[in-house]
C-alpha cells in the first residue's frame, strides 16, 4: 500500500474515532449547562449548526486545497477539530460549546481532503477500492469511538472530549510530519492562485453542471441513508420491542459488516462488473433490505436483512469513484468538498423529513418510511440509466474547458 494512502486512511480512522467518542456523551455534557428539559433542543441545534457550516464551507475548503495544496487545508481542519473538542472539554458556559461546533464546521474538511489526497495518488481504475477502504476506516473509527467514549465517560463527562482532542492532535502530528503533499503545484495556474471568492463559487457551479445527474444520485443515496440513521432506534423499539442492548448490538453488527463490504467488496465488484453495475448491485441489495424491513415482523429476521443493507455499502464508493474520474486532478479537492456538502445537507434535511413521515404514518403502518426509501432508489436507478456524463475537467481556463469537455 502506498504510504501516503495509508496515512490518509489512518487520518480518516482517527477523525471518525474522535467523532464517535463525543457523540454518545454530548447530551450528558449539555445537561450540565442547560438542564434535562432543554437537552434535546440544544443537541439538535448543535448538530444542525455543524452540518450547515459544512454545507457552506466544505466546497470552498476543497477548492482551497486545489489552490494551495492538501496538507495546509488538512492541518487547518484537524486543528479546528482539536480546538473544538478542547473547548468542549473545558467549557464553563454553553455558548463555548456552540463556538467549538462553529469552528469545527467551518474548518472541517478532513474527509474531503483525505479523499482528494487518495485521488491524487491512485490510478482511476482503483479509485472505487480506495474510496471503499476510506469508508471502511471511517466506519471502523465510528465503531471504536463510542466504546472508548463510554469507558472515558466513566472518569468524567469531560474526559471523552479530552480523548477526542488528543486523538485529533495525534492526527495533526501525523499529517504535519509524515503525510506528504500530493497536489502538483505546477498544475495550478496563476488564474487559480489569484481566484476571488466570486470566481470560486462560479467555478463550483461550472463543475457541477456536467455532473448534475450523478450528483443527484449521490444526494438521493445519502438521503436514504438518513432513514435508518434517524429511525432505527424508534423502529426497533416499536416493531420488535428491542431494548437498548439489542439496538446497540444491531448497530454494531451493521457497522462492522458495512465496513467489511466497503473495504473488501466494493473494489472487487467494481473491477469485475464496472462501476455502474456495482452501483446498481448496491442499490438493489439495499433496496431489497429496506423492503424487507417494512414487512418483517420477527426480531431474528433483521439479521439476514442487515447483510443486504451492508452489501448496499458498495454503492457510494463506486459512485464516488465514477464521479472522481470525470474531474481533472486540479479539481479533486473542489469535487470532494461538494460531495461533503451534499452529505451534510442530507444530514440536515433527512432527519426532519423522515421523522415527520414516520410520525405521520406510524399509526396506520410503521413500514411506510422504508417503502419511501425504495421509491427513492427507483428514481436513482432511472437517473443512473439515462444520464451519461462526459469527462470534465475543472475550468482552469476557457480554452482548456473547450478541449476537454
Swiss-Prot record:
UniProt keyword Translocase, yes or no: no
Membrane topology: Multi-pass membrane protein
GO molecular function: antiporter activity
Transmembrane intervals: 6-27, 42-62, 74-94, 102-122, 131-151, 159-179, 215-235, 245-265, 278-298, 299-319, 337-357, 364-385
Keyword entries, A-Z: Antibiotic resistance, Antiport, Cell inner membrane, Cell membrane, Hydrogen ion transport, Ion transport, Membrane, Plasmid, Transmembrane, Transmembrane helix, Transport
GO cellular component: plasma membrane
Biological process annotations from GO: proton transmembrane transport; response to antibiotic
Function: Resistance to tetracycline by an active tetracycline efflux. This is an energy-dependent process that decreases the accumulation of the antibiotic in whole cells. This protein functions as a metal-tetracycline/H(+) antiporter.
NCBIfam families linked to this entry: tet_MFS_A_B_C_D, tet_MFS_E
UniProt cross-references to PANTHER family, sorted A to Z: FI18259P1-RELATED, ZGC:174356
Family: Belongs to the major facilitator superfamily. TCR/Tet family.
Entry protein name: Tetracycline resistance protein, class E
Species name: Escherichia coli
